[in-house]
Amino acid sequence: NIYYILYILSVGCYAMSIDGIGFQYIWPNHPVWNDYAIGISLYGVILWALIFTRRFLSTRAKSPQMDRVLKIVIVVRSAVFLFELLFYPEFFEYRIIEIIPLSIIFYIGMKIWLRGYRPARFFVIAYGLLLAGFLLRSFVYFNFLSITTISHYSLHFSFVIEMLFLTFALGDRIRILKNKRDRALKRIIHQNETNLELKDKVNRELEEKVGERTVELNSKNSELAESNQK
């Protein structure tokens, strides 16, 4: 899935940006870009997460109302990003706002799961962990929690575990789609076999009737010939 790949790339860029690894090893000569890297990469994370959610959960078919909600969130988040980028780059620091789209993704995943879509269970776990990581990091940012190794890298841990469960979700979805395809193929094969059997049966019955009719005609012809001889 191309959207999942773009999402992973955005996550990697965001992780390198907040840790300073990107500035240290990749763009050390571009300090201006470093000021924007966190905000731009985080926007990429949220954007591709929202689009991936639409595709993975098939919200257009399974829940048109939730699909409209996701579209609205994409438009609003994109508008906020452009406003930050063009007018107030310092607003990129308010990363706590990402809790809103992540909460919406989590809620929609739960709703689709409860409707019986099995692959959504791993999806819900994945984004539930990511949402928890964002919340924990926000608590540290607002000094509600002290900085420890676990709290400082909580978001990194969440991203890693989230990707693991998203991989499970994708694998589960592929397996289910394959099973559906196999069942449909078996139904088609069975129907074709039934049609062939019916065709053979009709042909046999037709041949039998033609044979019977031929015997009758031959018998009548014989009778007629005998009658003429007399």
Predicted regions mapped to residue ranges:
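Juxtamembrane interface at the cytosolic side of transmembrane helices
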Residues: N1-L6
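Amphipathic alpha-helical coiled-coil "transmission" helices that mediate dimerization
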Residues: I176-K230
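Interfacial "cap-and-anchor" motif at the non-cytosolic start of specific transmembrane alpha-helices
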Residues: S10-H190
